[in-house]
Amino acid sequence: MKDQIAMLASNRKENSVIPDMNILENMYLSEHTLSAWKPAISKKKEIERYKKYKEMLNIKANSCEDLITSLSGGNQQKVFLARWLNTDAEILLLDNPTQGIDVGAKAEIYKLILELAKQGKTILINTLEIPEIQKVADYCAVFYNGEIIKILEHQEIDEMTVMMYSTNAAQAEEGK
């Protein structure tokens, strides 16, 4: 965050949700963490920003004072995206950003990722969902045994090609 990098961790229930905190507190957790580097914002300003992100991300919540656990998984994920968008980071690391959420929420997150990329943000996505990669990626780095084996351009990304490189089948064929 300090160096303009933000990360949306996978498994939101273990890595992001603070169940005893409300939506607003969960959304601004990073803001309070950053207060050592910059002045904290007022509750009024937090609520204004909450309303902005609620509309922008289509977060379905009755009140910002409701517990985060009252939201669906997709809406929780949007709150955590707002948490990091609020930092205005230049680089976003998204680890399985649509894992365990409904199709509608996935589409909204894809739209947001594309919009952020248009704004010049660098977005690195870790996912096993190849259709997700096809929708939002300019490039796809395929790993095998912890090393990048191949970098595919957007038009090269398809399930067969990604699977071939990720299982090292392409290198086995080239070695024959």
Where are the predicted features?
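Glycine-rich phosphate-binding loops of nucleotide-dependent enzymes
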Residues: 1-176
